[in-house]
Amino acid sequence: KLSRTGHTSWTLEEIDFEDGPYQDENITDTTLTPSHTTGSSRTITASAVTGINGGHGFQTTDVGRLISIGHQAAAWAASTSYSVGAVVRNSGNVYECIKAGTSAGSGGPSGEGDEIVDNNCTWKFLRDGGIQWGYAKVTGRTSTTEVTVTVNETFGGTSAETKWRLGAFSETTGFPAAVAFYEQRLFFAGTTEQPQTLFGSKSGDYENHTPGTLDDDPVIYTLA
């Protein structure tokens, strides 16, 4: 991206996309298993190559690509101490603790919002569905079924999961050939693998492609 911070001050740098955009969620039986929930020089291991790059598995061109894996979030618990960053599921939704404290004796967070009070805890609605999605960036390829990664958003566990999705932009899939601003979103389109798909950012947050269900969340649309 090209940034202008002064009359004669210009900077050209690579965009660091936040959590996406992604291709469609996996529908095969192939699982991905992260070795750790956080950190760098971690590994993600696939149970098979099915569903990964057209059945060819991980490629060296996947370096720099994002991988997102979903685990069931921990259930909210009554009268429990939570620290900032803790993620729980309650009432069919997923919430992140943004103010540490002790949860209420019953009920817990519900609905959508950025500051949901739960006794002296405060929660932020993340998404519906009860799944905690973490994501990592590929830093190396060991084989067609294993890559090394840096975890950017904490995974919900280290179990093998079929809920995963691969980044839409990479040397493997191609990068967008077209870009435009529209209604406070930054849209990208024209990748080699998905030439008819539009990827729109979160409203007013041009590098944020975190999947969600709110009105201002990122959008993906494929022309028929």
Residues covered by each model-derived region:
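Beta-propeller and closely related beta-pinwheel folds
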Residues: 161-185, 189-224
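A generic "cationic amphipathic patch" detector
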Residues: 98, 109-111, 199
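Autoprocessing Asn-cyclization modules and mimics
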Residues: 2-4, 9-104, 122-159
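Generic preference for flexible, low-structure residues
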Residues: 18, 26-28, 33, 111-113, ...
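Residue-level marker of intrinsically disordered, low-complexity segments enriched
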Residues: 25, 42, 47, 114-115, ...
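Broad, structure-driven detector of short, well-ordered beta-strand segments within folded domains
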Residues: 1-2, 179
